[in-house]
Swiss-Prot record:
Pathway this chain belongs to: Alcohol metabolism; ethanol degradation; acetate from ethanol: step 2/2
PANTHER family recorded: ALDEHYDE DEHYDROGENASE-RELATED (PTHR11699)
Name of the featured protein: Aldehyde dehydrogenase X, mitochondrial
Sites bearing N6-succinyllysine, chain numbering: 52, 81, 364, 383, 399, 414, 426
Gene Ontology molecular functions: aldehyde dehydrogenase (NAD+) activity; NAD binding
UniProt keywords, alphabetically: Acetylation, Mitochondrion, NAD, Oxidoreductase, Transit peptide
Site (Transition state stabilizer): 186
A GO cellular-component term linked to this record: cytosol
Source organism (scientific name): Homo sapiens
Recorded superkingdom: Eukaryota
Upper classification of the organism: Eukaryota, Metazoa, Chordata, Craniata, Vertebrata
Alphabetical list of PROSITE patterns matching this protein: ALDEHYDE_DEHYDR_CYS (PS00070), ALDEHYDE_DEHYDR_GLU (PS00687)
Amino acid sequence: MLRFLAPRLLSLQGRTARYSSAAALPSPILNPDIPYNQLFINNEWQDAVSKKTFPTVNPTTGEVIGHVAEGDRADVDRAVKAAREAFRLGSPWRRMDASERGRLLNRLADLVERDRVYLASLETLDNGKPFQESYALDLDEVIKVYRYFAGWADKWHGKTIPMDGQHFCFTRHEPVGVCGQIIPWNFPLVMQGWKLAPALATGNTVVMKVAEQTPLSALYLASLIKEAGFPPGVVNIITGYGPTAGAAIAQHVDVDKVAFTGSTEVGHLIQKAAGDSNLKRVTLELGGKSPSIVLADADMEHAVEQCHEALFFNMGQCCCAGSRTFVEESIYNEFLERTVEKAKQRKVGNPFELDTQQGPQVDKEQFERVLGYIQLGQKEGAKLLCGGERFGERGFFIKPTVFGGVQDDMRIAKEEIFGPVQPLFKFKKIEEVVERANNTRYGLAAAVFTRDLDKAMYFTQALQAGTVWVNTYNIVTCHTPFGGFKESGNGRELGEDGLKAYTEVKTVTIKVPQKNS
């Protein structure tokens, strides 16, 4: 699962080049205040109707940070009602100039930039990702995505069409309406920006359900939405669980569209709920088992580095992680040796320390899931070359893990692990590896490493994936569409294509007395 703005998953050194010394990075706030723990509905902070709360946990220590409101169906109803009222004809939001919507988004970006250190610290506390990545990558991307779509606000429009006969015809791009958005825990602020920015730029209203594992940064951003000047009801933020609050959004007959980022299994449920309710529009960005293919003529050092970061970045918790590394037979042994050495050198530890490269998994459930897959890989006959166990005595840390001798029919080769586990495969021929790479239910991303342009172009056409990288990995910007083939989802986010998901095209035809060219 996520993304945006500045190139994302380059080597740690490359990704944080502007902050190449500890002095260049600001010091994190180790114990940030938590001012917001309620639901944000109609620009007001409210308790859940049930008065229930649930804990959010620091994955570095396993200790509870605090409790937030547990929203459910009744709260979703309140939020949808507020969003519907904000979207009614003649409301301040509907009457607002498109350029003013863009100004509000730019104002929101300004406020995020003002509070960047605090937001990055909050993200690291609640999610566990290294602070230097929260600050230098995620927050950079968040700011840019709001600014990018702010620029689109008054430039997304229809066109005139030269019809036959005495008619004048034009199209309008109108907002879909009330948009339900359900975001994941691996990139909380980034995913919030991916969904909010295009929806607001095109004039929609939003009911967003944030991940129960990482609610804190999204709630703080809600306070910035109010400070920026968005009218009441335009953005509503619900904290709660997927089977209750998330399901209520997907099933709600007064929600016009739902956008979801998360697992393929839940994506199936959301698609079904949309069909069973009001046939609401659906955008899904789901799981992946993305291949990285290394040919014998590739720059070995560069390919090792890129394939390492493609998998281990964000603790392996990326929907587009390069979780199947295919290496041509003639260089396989050397590549494997270098890969293992690279994994052993990766620094795991306290994410608030500025030289940490890998923090904990997001929660106990993910921690146990990943360890379970490691045990399964060993049981199935893959060769464990490094890692494979817990790091430290508390928190949810796992040592960077590399498997060799992996076969395509093993579960670690087919299923999304979503953790720091890199399986390596050997191949002989290009046609063979293309067939194997495509032999998956997923199709989110892929990469090929080669110096041969003809081979590179062949792979870009042959691989079944929404994004194909050549000699790099995880370069995702706010200008470029992102989404998957097959069971990795439908629709696209980001770029001009990302706006299409949030508008309806209306055709207007007018009878005229006389038409002139």
